Amino acid sequence: DDCIVVEYYIVTDSRFTQRFDSDQAVTDYVTVMFTGVQNLIDTLNLDIKVRLLGVTPYHKESEPSFIDDSLLPGHETYVDARKIVRNMKFYFCNHNTGLAKSADIIMLLITRKMGVLDPGDTDISEIAGASSISSVCQRCNNVGACVDNSDYNERADTVAHESVHLLGSPHDGEGPNGLGLPNSPGAANCPDSDGYIMGTRNEQNGKKFSECTKQCVKYLLSLPRASCVYENCSK
């Protein structure tokens, strides 16, 4: 029988790395975080396993330029959410070797704030993560970035949230438009206010996914384009 295993390669920006005493400490932290991600993904009830292939903590001298290239002009304390995803795609498309090549999802963890600044706006909309929708298994597209600015509150929820975007789900309350999946059920039937992970995350439901999210992920996983997450169970 086939098992569904989503394999991750995690990279951390130099500011994130600086919070730890060693590269091993970064890896240990991310490993604990992924236990939390697995617990949240389990609420989809789709028997999806998450597997951490490895972690590369960037340091000032080794950090690729795509991170600094993604800062919001005039607001350099922020990473531009749209730019970071675009620049990550380009970088890992050109550096498609090793763990980056093996991974189903490549995720960047940063400590800087992330935001979106629309033309004409002066206020930045702050967000916790950004990713390429429905792009698991799609080389050169299978990327996301998450903010984690606290040593104690491991942001497993943000990683799980962005993972599910990559696995074909919109936010609760949103239809399938923009998913790039013509026959996806979308999530318009599950109100944002129900408080699930892809919605407003309330006390009652904030640690689980809605039925709509489940159906969207199930749909993408039924397509040939998601074949990279299937493997022989004996592995």
Swiss-Prot record:
Superkingdom of this protein's organism: Eukaryota
Subcellular location: Secreted
Glycan attachment residues as annotated in the record: N232
Keyword Acetylation attributed: no
Activity modulation notes: Inhibited by EDTA.
Cofactor annotation: Zn(2+)
Entry's family note: Belongs to the venom metalloproteinase (M12B) family.
Keywords attached to this entry: Calcium, Disulfide bond, Glycoprotein, Hydrolase, Metal-binding, Metalloprotease, Protease, Secreted, Toxin, Zinc
Co-factor binding details: Binds 1 zinc ion per subunit.
InterPro entries in UniProt: MetalloPept_cat_dom_sf (IPR024079), Peptidase_M12B (IPR001590)
GO cellular component: extracellular region
Protein name: Venom metalloproteinase antarease-like TpachMP_A
Tissue expr: Expressed by the venom gland.
Pfam families, per database record: Reprolysin_5
SUPFAM superfamilies with a match to the protein in the record: Metalloproteases ('zincins'), catalytic domain
Annotated binding of Zn(2+), by residue: H161, H165, H171
The organism of origin for this protein: Tityus pachyurus (Colombian scorpion)
EC number: 3.4.24.-
Domain Peptidase M12B span(s) in chain numbering: 4-233
